[in-house]
């Protein structure tokens, strides 16, 4: 059976089109071994977590077998929030979080997006979890990755250089790990 990936886009006007390049790159790198499902999330310009949560749940339910979840930027933080609040309808074979904002950091205080107090324990049944971030990310500060690393030592941290917020539209490192799952 093919591996099935659910890729959740970032937020903001034009994010779906921008992240489509990431999803397409990942599909090209993985070839016929995987299917990358890339749904357009509701109201990308003014994201509401509840609407995205419902869409994530619906898309996750149509996957066959184990799911691999990937989120970019706001999509990464919404994947994390979803997994801390809900029991996924499918077994999760891996989680890949790209340029995830740490909600609650200075100038990033959005209560609706923040994780609960005991969010780390929610991931005890889900492994592996990878966090990727480029040191030169111009949207989400690299310090957000450091905050996750401090609070979430079980996560596998991948620090990249010169890739920016969109990873130069190249997810080679992510694809290499997915091939091993």
Model-identified regions with their sequence ranges:
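Active-site catalytic motif of lipid deacylating hydrolases and related acyltransferases
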Residues: 2-63
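Catalytic histidine-centered segment of alpha/beta-hydrolase-like enzymes
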Residues: 47-49, 163-175
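Catalytic active-site module of serine/aspartate enzymes centered on a nucleophile-bearing elbow/loop
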Residues: 59-63, 170-181
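Conserved alpha/beta-hydrolase fold motif
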Residues: 69-70, 95
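Gly/Ala-rich beta-loop-alpha elbow adjacent to hydrolase catalytic centers
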Residues: 70-79
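A conserved short beta-strand
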Residues: 89-103
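Short beta-strand/loop motif that positions the catalytic acidic residue
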Residues: 125, 130-133, 137
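Conserved alpha/beta-hydrolase "acid-adjacent" motif
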Residues: 138-144
């Amino acid at each position: 059976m093919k591996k099935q990936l659910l890729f959740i886009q970032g937020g903001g006007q034009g994010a779906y089109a921008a992240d489509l390049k990431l999803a397409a790159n990942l599909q090209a790198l993985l070839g016929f071994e995987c299917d990358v499902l890339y749904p357009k999330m509701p109201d990308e310009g003014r994201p509401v977590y509840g609407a995205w949560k419902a869409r994530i749940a619906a898309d996750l339910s149509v996957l066959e077998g184990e799911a691999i979840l990937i989120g970019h930027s706001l999509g990464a933080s919404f994947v994390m929030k979803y997994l801390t609040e809900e029991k996924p309808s499918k077994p999760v074979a891996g989680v890949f979080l790209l340029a995830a904002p740490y909600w609650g950091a200075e100038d990033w205080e959005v209560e609706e997006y923040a994780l609960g107090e005991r969010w780390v324990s929610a991931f005890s049944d889900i492994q592996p979890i990878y966090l990727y971030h480029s040191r030169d990310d111009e949207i989400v500060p690299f310090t957000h990755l450091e905050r996750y690393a401090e609070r979430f030592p079980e996560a596998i941290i991948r620090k990249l250089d010169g890739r920016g917020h969109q990873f130069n539209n190249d997810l080679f490192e992510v694809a290499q790990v997915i091939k091993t799952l």
